[in-house]
């Protein structure tokens, strides 16, 4: 009898890659809001008027606002909310960066752990990660640069719709067109402007509220800058905690997380929280590895000891609930009225709820079998492989082609009733998402992979080991 080899189980962090892929879809969905509004408004262009229009004059927007409670249902809210997804991205980055450190510290005696050994083990990853993120962020601005200079992209599209004055609570991300740079007279001036924006990627210690923080050719890169800044803070904290016991580390980190949230920081507390989750997950990971090595237990039947999956499912549900907290008028959301009454936004801002939810999701998802299988599925893994590329390329494509695509789809299907509206929406969404995936696949193959190889080679050539 021929025995087929047993399939290799997914790695202990494969679900993290799948989760990143799912989060990339959520970010894509979040940036569709103004696209849908302008695409719908194109179907009945407004008459020229000297006074600015209210965004609520658009029937689709007015209908959505009148039915706002439907869009605040937990889980449904997560499907199109960028803030919780960004928070979870930051927590994941801190988790992945710290997991290697936690494994190293658990296997290395304190007496033999020296700063030199730590820098030798982790210096390469810090160098490669920082350089790789910078190079890819700069490369992602090339296509928007061409679109702006050739005149294909028009940053005044919102003004041409008459929406020149937007109330802060009613912007629906329509102001993001203004974040792009103006078209310069010559190619040389435009190239110099691009160079200045590339330099912004490196200046990670500028305050996020400053105009110079976000590179204008790809405004989503503000998260990359925040990620780089938090990763440097995390690396310093790793070194500072070398001689600290595990329990004391967790206490110090918890204090850092609380203080960071209290002063309004976003990325650093989430990175430190990711480290805490890595510290908590590591013992269970070691038990699982020992079980897999045991001859008495086949690999595919390995059981996971640890907290009750039902309890973790409850924690996951609570995390999703907190992450779904509305940023606009939470008092009008039926399922959040009690929470908002007990803890007003003045005490705990919406983004803090998103951070707490992200931490709970990262902590619990690993031990919820159904959620983990979804993240380890082939589709999620494919999206995870291309998640960074999707994040980098989707924004300029969505705002450049999205409004016209949705207008075309609704022109074909109609938009007078819910059925025809949904058909047109589905067609436009599918075409746009496939286009973004194709662009991301090309970016991953022809930009991301070569950049990774270039960074690896540069590190090998620059390493002190070459001088020995």
UniProtKB/Swiss-Prot annotation:
Q: Name one GO cellular component term.
A: membrane
Work out whether the entry's keyword set contains Ribosomal protein: no
What switches on expression, per the entry, is described as: Expression is induced on squalestatin S1-producing YMG medium.
Q: Which InterPro entries match?
A: Acyl_transf_3_dom, Acyltransferase_3
What EC number(s) does this enzyme carry? 2.3.1.-
Pfam families hit by this protein: Acyl_transf_3
Superkingdom to which the source organism belongs: Eukaryota
State the organism of origin. Answer: Phoma sp. (strain ATCC 20986 / MF5453)
Q: What is this protein called?
A: Acyltransferase R4
Q: Which GO terms describe its molecular function?
A: acyltransferase activity, transferring groups other than amino-acyl groups
Main location class: membrane
Membrane topology per the entry is:
Multi-pass membrane protein
Gene label = R4
Asked if the record carries the keyword Transmembrane, the reply is yes
